[in-house]
Amino acid sequence: MTTSTSPSSTDAPRATAPESSSSSSSSSSSSSSTSSVGASGIPSSSELSSTIGYDPMTASAALSAHFGSYYDPTSSSQIASYFASSQGLGGPQYPILGDQSLCYNPSVTSTHHDWKHLEGDDDDDKDDDKKGISGDDDDMDKNSGGAVYPWMTRVHSTTGGSRGEKRQRTAYTRNQVLELEKEFHTHKYLTRKRRIEVAHSLMLTERQVKIWFQNRRMKHKKENKDKPMTPPMMPFGANLPFGPFRFPLFNQF
């Protein structure tokens, strides 16, 4: 019985020895990790460089050689911190360089809103134009017959067009009116051939000559309608059936 218990007592320390060695190794690794992190809990730049695989000095020298005087070597530490923060390693946060007043300047924001307001007005104006809403300028265009400039007068066709469209009155010159009056006193009604000749001689269209004669005949009828129809004065004995009265001569013998 004494011989069987002695080997088991000797084997127990041997079995517990690896456990103590593993615990000592884990404690040493944890102590090394805590020592590497440091008292502040933030890794140093050298440790970050070894972890990320980025050397600030090498990158700074390469960038200086490539860009020359345009590269600032002092920004290498900021680049390292940026890569550390992007990898989620909790690198040191550097303040943003430059003036931050522009980010919160109320005048800049108000100017931005003003520009947005003006752009909105332009969009509203475009919408109004699409909807057909007319303003003062549109009313002026309607009053002027849609002509913006004096030379943009609307000339209607003399041969056709819509019946509901009002035609522009033809402005006859003084010479044309004089020649038409002469022709009217000669002939109240013109034939087709004569109408074409008059239109060609006065540089007018056949329709213009026809309309002028129609208006002139209406004017002539109105003038004669207002006048009383009085017979002309005849001289005494001019149209009597008998000859002039003569006294007989008694002393002819």
From Swiss-Prot:
One of its GO terms (molecular function) is DNA-binding transcription factor activity, RNA polymerase II-specific. Its main location: nucleus. This is Homeobox protein lin-39. A motif (Antp-type hexapeptide) lies at residues 148-153. PANTHER family: HOMEOTIC PROTEIN DEFORMED (PTHR45771), HOMEOTIC PROTEIN SEX COMBS REDUCED (PTHR45771:SF6). Residues 165-224 bind DNA. Residues 1-46 have a biased composition (Low complexity). Transcription factor. Binds to the consensus 5'-TGATNNAT(G/T)(G/A)-3' PBC/Hox motif of target genes to regulate gene expression; sem-2 in order to promote cell fate specification in the postembryonic mesoderm (also known as the M lineage), and egl-18 and elt-6 to regulate vulval development. May bind to the PBC/Hox motif as a heterodimer with homeobox protein ceh-20. Regulates vulval precursor cell (VPC) differentiation, in concert with orphan nuclear receptor nhr-25. Disruption phenotype: Lin-39 and mab-5 double mutants have reduced sex myoblast specification-specific expression of sem-2 in the developing mesoderm. RNAi-mediated knockdown in L1-stage larvae significantly reduces the fraction of unfused P5.p-P7.p cells that express egl-18 and elt-6. Belongs to the Antp homeobox family. Deformed subfamily. Disulfide bonds: none annotated. It holds the Pfam family Homeodomain. Residues 1-53, 115-148 are annotated as: Disordered. InterPro entries: Antp_homeobox_Deformed_sf (IPR050609), HD (IPR001356), HD_metazoa (IPR020479), Homeobox_antennapedia (IPR017995), Homeobox_Antennapedia_CS (IPR001827), Homeobox_CS (IPR017970), Homeodomain-like_sf (IPR009057).
